[in-house]
């Protein structure tokens, strides 16, 4: 996958190109990230990248000419046709389905806004989609862009040692993930559930599914409303709820 980033602070992206799963993907040649700074496309000696909004009001907007030139340069460098994304609070909220959808693209261009945002005509003429990581305001689009890349690259074949890790994570099937345990067997008097040490893979699979359903019911019940549970899943969820209610009496 190729990702082009338009940012006034391209140095921030070394945190994902040099470290962790994304860094390993870069080293393996499975992910390539190029950055363009609108400041490098300015035409004045002060390298100005902001401008006043028409109609007045507080704050500044990103200047059109340097931003548009940076976008055009990124498009020419893309591996094939790239989907252009503007990270924006007004965009579609990123979720697991959206991540998997974006992972189908060979190339993405991510525009990281600053100040009060960008000229609406840039969005209309240059941007394919707007995406948001949540209903809150940040100082720029760099962190949302890095979040998007980190989530999407997990679905690039070969990035994860075990692709099942991506398929079984929280939200991959619309549910929260089940609890996980490692050594020691007993920690401060709390033991690992016996079923996980039984070696019976069928029982372990059912336990994990039940815990995943139950944890979703406890913590994010609205997610269950989006799912069509099978009879077996309904049975496991009902069993979890009975056991949970009995444990708090």
UniProtKB/Swiss-Prot annotation:
It is found in: Cytoplasm. It comes from the Bacteria. One of its GO terms (molecular function) is tRNA (guanine(37)-N1)-methyltransferase activity. GO terms for cellular component: cytosol. Coiled coil: none annotated. Specifically methylates guanosine-37 in various tRNAs. This is tRNA (guanine-N(1)-)-methyltransferase. It comes from Photobacterium profundum (strain SS9). The gene is trmD.
């Amino acid at each position: 996958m190729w990702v082009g980033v338009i940012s006034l602070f391209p140095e921030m992206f070394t945190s994902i190109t040099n470290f962790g799963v994304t860094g390993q993907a870069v080293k393996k040649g499975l992910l390539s990230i190029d950055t363009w700074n609108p400041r490098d496309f300015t035409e004045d000696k002060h390298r100005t990248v902001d401008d006043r909004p028409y109609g007045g009001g507080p704050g500044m907007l990103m200047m059109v000419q340097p931003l548009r030139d940076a976008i055009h340069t990124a498009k020419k460098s893309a591996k094939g046709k790239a989907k252009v994304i503007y990270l924006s609070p007004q965009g579609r909220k990123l979720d697991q389905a959206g991540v998997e959808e974006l992972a189908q693209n060979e190339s993405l261009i991510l525009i990281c806004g600053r100040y009060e945002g960008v000229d609406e005509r840039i969005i209309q003429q240059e941007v394919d989609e707007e995406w948001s990581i949540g209903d809150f305001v940040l100082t720029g689009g760099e962190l949302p862009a890095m979040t998007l890349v980190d989530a999407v690259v997990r679905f690039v074949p070969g990035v994860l040692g075990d692709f099942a890790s991506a398929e079984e994570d929280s939200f991959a099937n619309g549910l929260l993930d089940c609890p996980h345990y490692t050594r020691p067997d007993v920690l401060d008097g709390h033991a690992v559930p016996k079923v996980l040490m039984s070696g019976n893979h069928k029982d372990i699979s059912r336990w994990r599914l039940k815990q995943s359903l139950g944890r979703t019911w406890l913590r994010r019940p609205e997610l269950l409303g989006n799912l069509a549970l099978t009879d077996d899943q309904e049975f496991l969820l009902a069993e979890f709820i009975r056991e949970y209610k009995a444990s708090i009496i």
